[in-house]
């Protein structure tokens, strides 16, 4: 089913969708005002503004921008990519 395929991407779903975050929820639990796809049966979409600050390096909105003193202007993910071993991605 579609939800299982999307959930298989895990945290990388947000990269596939080019967004700061993404969640897959049960179709039946979608609010009445959710957008419903005419092309993909079983797909409803709800959009909301991302929380946190925009990282100037990756442009993702996240709550950990500035948490690392040595790299106070970027998010934790970017710190890992710039000063650490970097993130390991499987899909995107």
Curated annotation (Swiss-Prot):
Its cofactor is Zn(2+). Keywords: Aminoacyl-tRNA synthetase, ATP-binding, Cytoplasm, Ligase, Metal-binding, Nucleotide-binding, Protein biosynthesis, Zinc. GO terms for molecular function: ATP binding; isoleucine-tRNA ligase activity; metal ion binding. GO terms for cellular component: cytoplasm. Binds 1 zinc ion per subunit. InterPro entries: tRNAsynth_Ia_anticodon-bd (IPR009080), Znf_FPG/IleRS (IPR010663). GO terms for biological process: tRNA aminoacylation for protein translation. The keyword Cytoplasm applies. It is found in: Cytoplasm. Belongs to the class-I aminoacyl-tRNA synthetase family. IleS type 1 subfamily. Monomer. Catalyzes the attachment of isoleucine to tRNA(Ile). As IleRS can inadvertently accommodate and process structurally similar amino acids such as valine, to avoid such errors it has two additional distinct tRNA(Ile)-dependent editing activities. One activity is designated as 'pretransfer' editing and involves the hydrolysis of activated Val-AMP. The other activity is designated 'posttransfer' editing and involves deacylation of mischarged Val-tRNA(Ile). IleRS has two distinct active sites: one for aminoacylation and one for editing. The misactivated valine is translocated from the active site to the editing site, which sterically excludes the correctly activated isoleucine. The single editing site contains two valyl binding pockets, one specific for each substrate (Val-AMP or Val-tRNA(Ile)). This is Isoleucine--tRNA ligase. The gene is ileS.
